[in-house]
Regions:
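Extracellular carbohydrate recognition
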Residues: 151-154, 163-178, 184-188
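Bacterial Sec-dependent N-terminal signal peptides
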Residues: 1-36
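Extended polysaccharide-engagement surfaces of secreted carbohydrate-active enzymes
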Residues: 470-909, 913-942, 969-971
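Extracellular ligand-binding interfaces
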Residues: 72-149, 166-168
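Aromatic-lined, polymer-binding surfaces characteristic
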Residues: 226, 230-520
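Extracellular carbohydrate-recognition regions
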Residues: 34-53
């Protein structure tokens, strides 16, 4: 949810000494002037004065902090003056400092309060205005950076508020000046539309609601709806009733509403209310009894359930009282509440509750204010226009606000407005469902879904459910999203189906949630909803058979959709099989027979892990070439459990084994490190078999080893993985470097591990071995996977492990069997070679000797080349420009290229990939698109394309063939060649 605060990018390399010096200087600067919170609980502060002393008073009529506020009963053009300690706004302070307060206005007016900041000479260098256009509490937040004024004199000794040219009064509370670090996501609103220029960046989409409010519909409002239009609108509303219907609300949700209401202590006062202050989470202090949007949600939803399902008149009365109070507190049309970021996650039930209460809302005296609030906070106003093609952070909007937008559209009292709003919403949704460029949020061309500038399945769940639900609501009506949009959406569904086994994904794809996250029931239901909206396969069927079959595989209960699909002859799909390339995530997914392997790296455009202050603190190695086997339908069943997990030993990774206090992220805020290397990702042949490769390098940070490098490749054929590593080097002489084979939960009654056929199943077991080609080591983990190591010092253990919780650093414990190749301390050009045989059958073990199934042609820092005997595939991971002497097909292959080929009769099937997205701008998120990369390979003999390819071209020079291939988006280019 939270937008990261500190991002490590591949083009930003901070020198440690400069960082320390900068932090030291900032601390000195901040130490000179302290943020001052002005309290009115003990009377009028001495530094405040007004044009007339009688204008100021302390009031209990309204408050936003404590139980009292400052009442200013002003005369025309009165001045409220506040003296402060000298504040010198150097460049750093001018960029970061500001002021925050809340102002209560009893009646909407057309004028403003003027704020001015004065130098010792009385010069006004900074100023801004605050519109009094709304009644109730409104936030007044602004940094000096965004104020008006000539900004010539930087010393401020006094500031003042100038009243309008009339009599009136306002109440002031929650005043802090100077604020040392203004909230970057300060939200423009009706009162202060220009208090933050950053909100025009799509990254701050939450804060753009007032900007979007200025949009005008370019869709005409119909004079009247036709009968067909009215019927379609009614169908959508009826379906929404069904979606939101509860068989019986939980007593807990109703009880929570009454308990929260009791704590809120809402009382009418003059023209407004007193009660628990409602503020954004960023300034919330629950120890003082303050509340936020989720408390409004708790009260409104609980009272709505009690009123709707139990016919409680008391609940109905309280429902509307809470609405009046919330609007008075600033949860209202045109209000930004200081900052509104991520509010969508806290208001969704407000909308579903409003739908249940819609008839009563339409009859209520405050109907207009309630509906305008619902419309504004749903951000429906953005949909008055089509979605811009470069809109960022779409997953948040789809997930949290698509249903609120839908409900808000249908809450309008005029059916013509409802119809137009729904048309606009569908157009916006359809135009947002396109393949977005660069690393901004949305769906990528390979089906990956992006959030926080990266491939993020944890944010995809819920998104699929929300859009799928909308499609089910609008199916068969004019409001249905376009076929093109649904086709893009399908690619995200298929991708999630591929990288989940059955519902869960691997740790490498987990972002900041390493042991959690899965497809939910609503996501699964949306497979059916999208299928029923129409065929997307091009076969001309009445519905999409592929999605329907996937739904039957994933859904285990009973539903009308399941019954329908089965009646149409659809059978549950088998689990996906093949090798799937997702290079927008530098990832490959290898699948057969209900198991799944997640292979994960990182590069200049793909971050390796998301680490927050309280999330995934030890997740540094998630993308260090991880090779995680999920042999069962869940992580736990596959042997992965956080309790006692050694964060240094994610299978497949090459890592320096650190104490947890050193593995813990050195940055207190967010770390999303990208590499300086481009070459990391996957390639496939016929989507059946594939390669994963990574040029591993570690960043230059505290407790990192900046010269740690390695070159790693995993060749995936059928149910075998050949893992090669070369150039493993670093100067860390304190802690050993390891390549982890496996780490899995050990159970006393389980299979334990096998070493060269001998079972070991005793807690505390540990054995060291040296593997050679003449005497390889054969291991079997407790989950029927076998490991054949041909090079290196191998260590195996069954141990009771002490670990740390990834969020709170508390001690955790668990029993695990583990095996790894020990490269020693400060290795130089270390190597490894091992084969993983995934769940071989008894028949396979009788008929196949796994080490005879492949040949390593080359394994050094220039290239890893393997020939697979069983499939006949030859695969190349080329790190540096390569010239080949004895190859049957290639003479030269350029650096950072993956190639796979297979001969068949007189033809050869070829796949070529560069996983580099080649995005020009290296930033947290960027709209800069993936750019084409030209690759020239030289083939021996004359070859020609069997059929034309838009991305491959051949030219003949003598008895050689120049093969030019255009790679883009990290998508493999596959084609067939034949001898000329």
């Amino acid at each position: 949810m939270a937008v990261p605060l500190v991002i490590l990018r591949s083009d930003i390399f901070m020198e440690k000494k400069l960082c320390i010096l900068a932090i030291f200087l900032l601390c000195i600067c901040f130490g000179r002037v302290h943020a001052q919170a002005w309290s009115f609980e003990g009377g009028i502060p001495s530094r405040l004065s007004a044009s007339c002393d009688k204008e100021l008073a302390i009031s209990e009529a309204y408050y936003k902090d404590g139980k009292k506020s400052l009442e200013w009963q002003f005369h025309p053009n009165s001045i409220l003056t506040i003296s402060n300690s000298n504040l010198l706004l150097d460049k750093d302070k001018a960029d970061k400092y500001g002021i925050t307060l809340w102002i209560y206005n009893e009646q909407p007016q057309k004028d403003s309060l003027q704020f001015q900041f004065l130098s010792p000479k009385g010069h006004i260098s900074y100023q801004f205005s605050f519109k009094l256009s709304a009644a109730g509490w409104r936030a007044c937040w602004i940094g000096f950076k965004h104020m008006l004024g000539d900004k010539k004199e930087q010393e401020i000794v006094q500031w003042r508020i100038i009243a309008p040219n009339r009599e009136g009064r306002v109440f002031i509370d929650r005043l802090t000046f100077p604020v040392k670090k203004m909230n970057l996501r300060t939200t423009p609103d009706q009162q202060m539309p220009y208090n933050n220029s950053l909100t025009f960046r799509d990254l701050w989409h939450w804060c753009r609601v007032w900007q979007w409010e200025q949009y005008q519909y370019d869709l005409p409002l119909p004079i009247a709806l036709t009968k067909n239009e009215r019927d379609e609108l009614h169908n959508v509303e009826t379906r929404l009733d069904h979606v939101l219907a509860l068989s019986m609300p939980s007593k807990e949700s109703i009880n929570d509403a009454y308990e929260t209401f009791r704590k809120a202590n809402i009382k009418r006062s003059l023209s407004g209310f007193t009660g628990a202050p409602i503020v954004a989470p960023d300034e919330l202090d629950r120890s003082k009894g303050e509340m936020s949007w989720n408390d409004i949600e708790t009260m409104l939803s609980g009272f709505a359930y009690d009123a709707h399902y139990n016919n409680s008149q008391d609940a109905e009365n309280k429902y509307f009282l809470v609405w009046d109070f919330a609007i008075d507190q600033g949860f209202a049309y045109g209000s930004g509440m200081g900052t509104n970021h991520h509010y969508g996650y806290q208001v969704r039930k407000i909308y579903s509750a409003a739908w249940l209460m819609r008839d009563k809302i339409w009859k209520s005296p405050n109907c207009d204010n309630i509906i305008s609030t619902l419309l504004f906070w749903s951000a429906l106003q953005e949909t008055r226009k089509a979605c811009t093609q470069e809109r960022d952070e779409l997953l948040d909007s789809w997930h949290t606000l698509l249903m609120p937008k839908t409900i808000a559209a249908l809450m309008q009292t005029d059916e013509r407005e409802r119809s137009r709003a729904l048309k606009g919403l569908t157009r916006w949704l359809s135009s947002s469902l396109h393949y977005t460029p660069g690393t901004i949020g949305g769906i990528k061309i390979d089906g990956t879904t992006f959030h926080h500038g990266g491939f993020y399945p944890a944010y995809t769940t819920g998104v699929l459910a929300s859009i799928g639900t909308y499609i089910s609501l609008t199916n068969g009506t004019q409001y249905e999203p376009t076929k093109e949009a649904r086709q893009v959406l399908k690619s995200a569904f298929i991708a999630m189906r591929n990288y989940c086994n059955k519902y869960e994904w691997g740790i490498g794809l987990s972002g900041r949630h390493p042991f959690s996250g899965s497809m939910k029931d609503d996501d699964i239901a949306s497979f059916a909803y999208l299928a029923l909206a129409g065929d997307l396969s091009g076969q001309g069927d009445a519905f999409d058979h592929q999605l329907a079959a996937d739904y039957l595989r994933l859904f285990t209960g009973e539903s009308k959709e399941k019954e329908f699909f089965k009646s149409q002859g659809i059978k549950a799909a088998k689990a996906p099989e093949g090798f799937f390339v997702y290079n927008y995530g530098a990832a490959g997914i290898f699948r057969r027979n209900n198991w799944m392997v997640t292979l994960k790296g990182y590069n200049t455009d793909v971050w390796g892990a998301e680490i927050y202050a309280k999330d995934n603190r030890y997740g540094r190695y998630q993308s260090y070439g991880s090779v995680q086997i999920m042999g069962q339908e869940s992580r736990k069943a596959s042997g992965y459990n956080e309790e006692g997990w050694d964060w240094n030993r994610l299978p497949g990774t090459t890592s320096i084994h650190l104490p947890f206090e050193l593995l813990d992220s050195p940055l207190p805020a967010t770390t999303m490190a990208k590499s300086r290397e481009h070459f990391s990702g996957a390639c496939s042949l016929e989507c059946k078999n594939g390669i994963f490769t990574t040029k591993l390098m570690e960043r230059d940070l505290k407790n990192f080893t900046s010269d740690f490098v390695a070159r790693k490749t995993v060749f995936c054929f059928e149910n075998r993985m050949i893992c090669l590593g070369t150039g493993i080097s670093n100067t860390n002489s304190i802690y050993p470097t390891e390549t982890t084979l496996f780490q899995s939960v050990w159970e006393k009654d389980g299979e334990g591990v096998r070493i060269n056929g001998q079972q070991k199943n005793q807690l505390g077991f540990h054995q060291n071995m040296h593997a050679t080609e003449e005497h390889p080591v054969c291991l079997q983990d407790g989950y029927r996977n076998q490991y054949y190591i041909k090079k290196g010092d191998v260590q195996v253990q069954i141990a009771h492990q002490e670990s740390r919780h990834e969020k709170n650093r508390e001690f955790t414990y668990g029993d695990f069997s583990s095996a790894w190749i020990n490269h020693g301390y400060a290795p130089q050009n270390g190597t490894y070679e091992y084969l993983v045989w995934i769940q071989p059958t008894a028949q396979e073990q009788k008929e196949i000797h796994p080490l005879d199934t492949y040949q390593v042609i080359q394994a050094n820092n220039n290239a890893h080349i393997v020939y697979d005997v069983i499939t006949g595939i030859k695969a190349y991971s080329v790190f540096e420009d390569l010239q080949l002497k004895d190859d049957l097909l290639f003479l030269e292959i350029p650096a950072e290229t993956m190639v796979m080929h297979k001969f068949s009769d007189e033809k050869v099937l070829v796949s070529i990939c560069d996983p580099n997205l080649n995005i020009q701008e290296k930033a947290y998120t960027t709209k800069s698109p993936s750019r084409p990369i030209s690759k020239r390979l030289i083939l021996c003999h004359q070859w020609e394309l069997v059929s034309e390819s838009p991305n491959a071209h051949v030219e003949h020079v003598g008895n050689q063939t120049l093969l030019d291939v255009i790679c883009q988006h990290g998508i493999p280019v596959e084609f067939s060649l034949q001898k000329k």
